């Protein structure tokens, strides 16, 4: 086992306690269908479940958002993003929130990408049974989930990258992506980022063929769909977000970028503020921006 893995796990245990307290203090939005714990791989693993949310009484096909939760690649589950996803569903979307196996032990980064592609593929095949407009599918991810979003978009567009991970085009064409306070570069000198690399890639991380995927600058292309990116005054990944902005400028990729400088209760907005508290004024502002950005990319024709 990597020497720092137990330390990282202890840190995430503390985060789990804080998340549990946060979730217990929040009231779930009402008026929404909540189909929970759908297996996208039938192996009995909690890591291979997803949830689907959409407004009750829906009579037409809705644009789709697929959400990938964050948690430093080693922590998290779809439930920590539940209220965020429900608030997006309130804005007129069908939202699918996915689990994936967490890094550590024998589980590596490529296993996680494989899981996410399995979830995408399941959605592409099965959303026809739900009020989903498969012509208008969007992707969202926060923190490590933002990194996963960048990587999976790149892989979905590139057959050689698909071969690296042993996956195929998933059947979904993402019209736009929301990267919320995303991790972007784990390789440049930065202890907070670098400490994760051996957990994700194993002992041979320096020679791993997956190493390049830990720096979005090595996989980004002009084919990327439009992105919404946000950060905040108290976001510890702010510099990473600005790096992504610079990459989009370099590659002429359409994007909307918002660095939130607002304060709430006299304090700076923190990392993934609109995910952990989608009920706050700033959280709702950011999530409304995401919804509006996605709606601006909606195509008229629907897939059956």
Q: Model-derived features: where do they sit?
A:
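Alpha/beta-hydrolase superfamily serine-hydrolase fold, recognizing
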Residues: 1-304
